[in-house]
Amino acid sequence: MKKSKYILASIFSVALLVFLAWFIYAGTHQPPMLKGNSKDGKWSVIYSPEKDIDLARQDLWAVHITWKRDSEFSIKEVVFKENGVVEASGDATDEPKNAKKIAVVIMGDPPNTNNDYTVEVTWEENGKTQKDIIQVNKEIKRSFVFPNVIKRILSLG
């Protein structure tokens, strides 16, 4: 009887150690997010994991642009490029008018830090059409992230 309890406790302990090791590894070995700002400071871009839990379940990443001013503006076109190749483009008409944060594209893969990412934004402000090209290359390291498996389990309840 004592021997079977010892074996059961040993198996449970090893399983717990393996789970904890995986949890720590998965939480600390995450790809970095990428960020960029326009030269005039009007726009900020971030390439990060999608926060919407339904999309996060699919391990999707999103590129969001944020308007950093209080003035009225209207987006004419947004183009997302990876290594100079257009990955997505649009006019953001599906976003609320004058939304400060706009989803540019939702990608299936995390960013590759060896690639060159740019976002070209064309907008109208005070009756004047303007264009900005934003380099998205500043790495933001993520020190600890809950693995998506754990997020999925927690979101079921």
Model-derived regions, located:
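Transition segment at domain starts
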Residues: 23-58, 142-153
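Positively charged n-region of N-terminal signal peptides that target proteins for export
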Residues: 1-6
